[in-house]
Amino acid sequence: MVYFVGAGSGAADLITVRGMHMLQQADVIIYAGSLVNPELLEYARADCEIHNSARLTLEEVIKLMQEAQAQGKMLVRLHTGEPSIYGAVREQMDALDELGIPYESCPGVSACFGAAASLNLEYTLPGVSQTLIITRMEGRLFLGVDCCCVIHVVSAHIWRLSLLRGLS
């Protein structure tokens, strides 16, 4: 079984309790070394096999997943933040579907919510803002249109909105 685990927004203690338990039980961990806080690996067992995916291709990552599954090992694919937001997990899930390897996702604390917490902010306030849009920086296209154009159209119909733009 492969578990996609969100590493949270950076601090090792911002991982979910479920995510921490999965790291503690994992036989194999594949993590994005350039993005994930290495302190999270301290939750791993001493005999856990740990792989930094920063220099691995998608094919090499999938091969490690296949090998772990064939050996009956529990594998954690540790992604930064919340895997469903800019996590690039779909291509891995598609490959696992093709191979018949079961997987499950464990959410993480997204950096956007970690930022709000550290600043003691609330994105939605009654009578002020009821909409939160999470988008990439300008230059990215959504249905062939620059994201900033989409935001402009949406904001024209909303009195006030909270906006968080990713840096990637």
Residue ranges and their predicted role:
Residues 1-2, 103, 112-168:
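Beta-strand/loop-alpha-helix module characteristic of Rossmann-like adenine-cofactor folds
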Residues 1-109, 114:
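Class I S-adenosyl-L-methionine
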